């Protein structure tokens, strides 16, 4: 894995991430104009970064945040649709893959139900090869309908890619799910705002380290009249070290070459920090020395995960017992979220 050049090779995937300035849009026509701007940016970037195999744009970069619910429903896209057609044409012309945000994608029961928050991975032939719907929307603010699974797709030069979105990345479970499905590069597109800059930079690095995987983060920048976005789009090696990171600048770009052979060699031959292998071969050294086989223990030792899988309602009740029983909070109401029932306070 290398940083500082504009090239790539048969063994390296050239990945660019963009601090796209958060747009403030109100209509389908404005969304399509912005999509065309993104398309032109891709073509320009390819001239400057001839090794670029994959370009990643942040969450909300296509549509912005539609703070008006009627505008959000009116601009919700179909996939494929007008927006993806623009992106597909740009990927073909620039001979590159791209990750793009659709906020939102029409629900199957549109307009009766809220849209999804969706990413698409488009290959260099203009084909949509992965569509991911955000599993963990940023409640209580985001009103997206949640998705229900992650995916892994063979990307440029065979690198295996998963997509996640913003608040998804605050939950170690989703990173592990992607990695255990075989993802070598986890792409996190986010529209993350202050104050949580330090926490988000730290989370991406920690999850790369914990999952022996590359991480590409594309985050919004600028101010949209409501939130201030901190940028810091970054590329992180599978050892948790940052290869390149933007600052807060609008339209900042970082680029690095991610080696396919190096991550596969590390996953096969690293030992003390091979977290994926060791999690499913717990204590293999001591068990081997004890004459109890050479595979360690594969069984899950974590009671919470057992309960969640076997009895999700019980797991929900358990977490409510230590947090709260309503989705709203009486001391700081958000919208019309219900706050019936007694809320916990410090010391109770």
Swiss-Prot record:
Protein name (database record): Aliphatic amidase
Function: Catalyzes the hydrolysis of short-chain aliphatic amides to their corresponding organic acids with release of ammonia. Also exhibits in vitro acyl transferase activity, transferring the acyl moiety of short-chain amides to hydroxylamine to form hydroxamates.
EC number: 3.5.1.4
Catalytic machinery residues: 59 (proton acceptor), 134 (proton donor), 166 (nucleophile)
Ranges of residues in domain CN hydrolase: 13-260
CDD domains, A to Z: aliphatic_amidase
Enzyme type, top EC level: hydrolase
Single annotated GO MF: amidase activity
UniProt organism field: Alcanivorax borkumensis (strain ATCC 700651 / DSM 11573 / NCIMB 13689 / SK2)
Coiled-coil regions listed: none
Annotated HAMAP family: Aliphatic_amidase
Family: Belongs to the carbon-nitrogen hydrolase superfamily. Aliphatic amidase family.
UniProt keywords, alphabetically: Hydrolase
Catalytic activity: a monocarboxylic acid amide + H2O = a monocarboxylate + NH4(+)
InterPro entries: Aliph_Amidase/BUP, Aliphatic_amidase, C-N_Hydrolase, C-N_Hydrolase_sf
PROSITE patterns in the cross-refs: CN_HYDROLASE
């Amino acid at each position: 894995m290398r940083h500082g050049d504009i090239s790539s090779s048969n063994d390296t995937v050239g990945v660019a991430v963009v601090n796209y300035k958060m747009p403030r849009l109100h209509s389908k026509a404005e969304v399509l104009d912005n999509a065309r701007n993104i398309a032109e940016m891709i073509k320009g970037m390819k001239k400057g970064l001839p090794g670029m195999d994959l370009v990643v744009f942040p969450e909300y970069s296509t549509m912005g945040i539609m703070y008006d619910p009627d505008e959000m429903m009116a601009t919700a896209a179909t996939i494929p649709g007008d927006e993806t057609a623009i992106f597909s044409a740009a990927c073909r012309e620039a001979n590159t893959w791209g990750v793009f945000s659709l906020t939102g994608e029409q629900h199957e029961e549109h307009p009766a139900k809220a849209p999804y928050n969706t990413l698409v991975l488009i290959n260099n032939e203009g084909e949509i090869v992965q569509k991911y719907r955000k599993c963990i929307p940023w409640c209580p603010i985001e009103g997206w309908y949640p998705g229900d699974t992650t995916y892994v797709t063979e990307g440029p030069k065979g690198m295996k890619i998963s997509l996640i979105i913003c608040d998804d990345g605050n939950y170690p479970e989703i990173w592990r799910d992607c990695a255990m499905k075989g993802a070598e590069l986890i792409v996190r597109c986010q529209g993350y705002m202050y104050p949580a800059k330090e926490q988000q930079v730290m989370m991406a690095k920690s999850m790369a380290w914990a999952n022996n995987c590359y991480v590409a983060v594309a985050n919004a920048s600028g101010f949209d009249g409501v939130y201030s976005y901190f940028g810091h789009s970054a590329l992180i090696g599978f050892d948790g070290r940052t290869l390149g990171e933007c600052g807060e600048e609008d339209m900042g770009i970082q680029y690095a070459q991610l080696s396919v052979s190096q991550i596969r060699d590390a996953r096969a031959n690293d030992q003390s920090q091979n977290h994926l292998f060791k999690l499913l071969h717990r204590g293999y050294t001591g068990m081997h020395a004890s004459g109890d086989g050479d595979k360690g223990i594969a069984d899950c030792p974590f009671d919470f995960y057992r309960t969640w899988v076997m009895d999700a309602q019980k797991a929900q009740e358990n977490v409510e017992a230590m947090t709260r029983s309503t989705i709203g909070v009486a001391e700081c109401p958000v919208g019309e979220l219900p706050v019936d029932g007694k809320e916990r306070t410090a010391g109770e």
